[in-house]
Amino acid sequence: MPELVATIGFFDGVHRGHRFLIDRVIEEAQRSGMSSAVITFDRHPREVLQTDYQPDLLSTLDEKLLLLSKTHVDNTVVLHFDASLAALTAQDFMRDVLQRQLKVRKLIIGYDNRFGHNRSEGFDDYVRYGKELGIEVICADAFLPDDVRVSSSVIRTCLREGRVEDANRLLGYDYTIESRIVSGYQNGRKMGFPTANLDVTRCQQLLPASGVYAVLVRLKDSVGWKRGMMNIGHRPTFNGTSTSMEVNLFNFSGDLYGQELLVSFISKIRDERKFDSIDALAEQLQHDKVQINMLFDTTYHIDDNLINIQ
């Protein structure tokens, strides 16, 4: 492997802040005549450090690698994060992994990034170790569009509050989840709005807040996106108790059971609520569909979004 200019992190979601940092790595590599690299991990470190931790991921590993490939970085290195890696001090990690294994000569880190056992050391420590090891350590500037901090945690907060448009602006693309279609209760079909029911237990990513959303949908192994509306919640009109994800695809008919579906969230239309009757719910769904089609016809342009990378 050639000498590297690298950055390191979990890069969940590969959002605009991550890509700002990666662009800095690529520029420095080109200026220095080296190769650029992103070093990441196959799982969230807290999954190893806290055995009961369930991460609210913005992207699966496969999706993260796809997103990273679109940055045009020369190399992506995925480290297996286990107890032995977690036990390495920052100095040991820089010597054993960065210098000896990967031949990193310049390390560019985010302004708030820490690594090494217990993340107990900081930038000045990394600079000192780097001088001993022949690794120049550089702290990248913060990415603050409109004075807003872009981070995975901020994006998760947006999604938990149903603010998918805010999340998408920070991501730089439409937030997308993946899951398998399973059999449902057929309630939507009876109302004239047949739905594909997604397996909540298989979805590895954070679900947005309960509500009705304008979405774009496609089968994982196909091309072309279809408009749709998705409900996330507990189906209160039908006295449901467990969380469900149901998506109605516009202008589509066919059997989708067992297939993997990608769903991109465009905008939240309304909160989920209990209706007095099924007819009242059906009437509201028709209004929702009209509103969603109007959104797609007037304000949303798919070519302006990175949804095409999925």
List each language-model region with its residue ranges.
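Classical nucleotidyltransferase
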Residues: 84-194, 276-280, 305-306
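N-terminal catalytic cores of NTP/NDP-binding nucleotidyl/phosphoryl-transfer enzymes
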Residues: 1-60
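Residue-level signal for inorganic ion chemistry
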Residues: 15, 68, 107, 167, ...
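A glycine-rich helix N-cap at a beta->alpha junction
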Residues: 60-77
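Phosphate/ribose-recognition catalytic cores of enzymes acting on nucleotide-derived substrates
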Residues: 184-310
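Glycine-rich, highly charged phosphate/nucleotide-binding loops
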Residues: 56-64, 88-94
